[in-house]
Amino acid sequence: ALDVQSQVREDLRIVAMSATLDGERLAGFLEAPRLSSAGRSFPVEIAHFPARRDEALEPQTRRAVEHALSTHPGDVLVFLPGHREITRVHSALQDVLAPAVQVLPLHGELSVEAQSQVLQPDPQGRRRVVLATNVAESSVTLPGVRVVIDSGLAREPHYDPN
């Protein structure tokens, strides 16, 4: 990006945003000022939903979502490990919740248009259940979400030199 900016588009500005990078080192490397923005905190209530070892992820997630919808207002965000699980849970939830609740997937393989739909309230005013990978944990704020269900599962890339 620095090469393009310096050689092709001097008018181009680079903005690097991260909650985890060392801001001072990055600002020094880019020879740029460091800007800071304070986040906001909200009260959080943590509850554990009992898992059933003999039950697959899809029915467990369905039970947790149905419980959340019946006991809490607002939309529900569910973190799942990957595209395959999102597709399976989406199908299971569509069968029991549609058309009263909008069930939306959110992962990197979706079109930009489909991803943007998640950022908008449902045009029919329905509650929403958003099924996302853990990438959404730190990259996007979804309006209307009042309950987050975390499966506790995530895919983490590993490098194997062999």
What are these regions (language model features)?
Residues 1-162:
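P-loop NTPase motor module signature
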